[in-house]
């Protein structure tokens, strides 16, 4: 049976004390590395060394700025004997971005770690070794400069989980929604205007009757 922990459901502004959006799958897989990732993991009894795979949806800070803390914790604090490096699955250019972010935050502290203990994977589809999951990555509608994508996560049982990343309504989501057992949408802004790069409460009405969960919330708790 698959386990999905919502360890953060807030948007970039962390409304009502919600931590930044992040999920943990089967206590081995993270989707994104928000700035609050270390306390988020500790709240559910995990640490950075518990994680075998990280999937990055896009480059915005509330999804990637936890990278320095995560890597630092994994190297020094929660280090354990591991047979394989951490696998980080992301789009081309992401290795340079996260490396620059991490080494800029902690110069010399991560020397050798990011090249030797992290395996950077740019494939659009992959099997997540050591888990019961595989994924297909697909483009979504968000700030283009952040190279936004979602993930169709495929469990060996046949269960399909559609993680839409940060996105407004788009063909990529609609084309895959029909084969998903659960759809995770972000609902990052209220109904106060036109926001093509986010779902609003009015937008998600179109998913009524489908198995949908929401994250990146701006609504009060």
Predicted feature descriptions by range:
Residues 215-221:
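Conserved small/polar residues in nucleotide/adenosyl-binding loops
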Residues 36-87, 182:
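Active-site metal-binding motif and surrounding structural segment of the metallo-beta-lactamase
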Residues 1-46, 119-175:
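Core dinuclear metal-dependent hydrolase active-site scaffold
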Residues 83-147:
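Metallo-beta-lactamase
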Residues 173-188:
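A short alpha/beta connector and helix-capping loop motif
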Residues 80-82, 176-178, 205-211:
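Short, conserved loop/helix-junction motifs that constitute active-site signature segments
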Residues 27, 51, 180, 209-211:
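Short, well-ordered alpha-helix to beta-strand connector turns
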Residues 196-205:
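Charged helix-capping and loop-helix junction motifs
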């Amino acid at each position: 049976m698959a386990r999905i922990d919502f360890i953060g459901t807030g948007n970039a502004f962390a409304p009502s004390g919600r931590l930044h959006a992040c999920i943990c799958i089967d206590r081995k897989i993270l989707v994104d590395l928000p700035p609050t990732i270390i306390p988020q993991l500790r709240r559910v009894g995990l640490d950075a060394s518990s994680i075998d795979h990280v999937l990055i949806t896009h480059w915005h800070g509330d999804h990637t700025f936890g990278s320095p803390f995560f890597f630092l914790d994994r190297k020094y604090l929660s280090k354990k004997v591991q047979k394989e490096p951490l696998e980080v699955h992301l789009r081309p250019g992401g290795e340079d971005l996260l490396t620059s972010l991490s080494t800029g935050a902690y110069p010399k502290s991560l020397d050798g770690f990011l090249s030797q203990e992290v395996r950077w994977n740019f494939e659009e589809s992959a099997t997540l070794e050591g888990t019961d999951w595989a994924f297909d990555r697909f483009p979504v509608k968000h700030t283009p400069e952040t190279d936004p994508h979602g993930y169709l996560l495929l469990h060996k049982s046949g269960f399909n989980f559609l993680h839409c990343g940060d996105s407004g309504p788009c063909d990529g989501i609609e084309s895959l929604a029909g084969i998903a057992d659960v759809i995770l949408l972000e609902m990052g802004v209220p109904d106060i205007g036109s926001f093509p790069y986010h779902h609003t409460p009015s937008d998600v009405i179109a998913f009524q009757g489908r198995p949908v969960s929401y994250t990146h919330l701006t609504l009060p708790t």
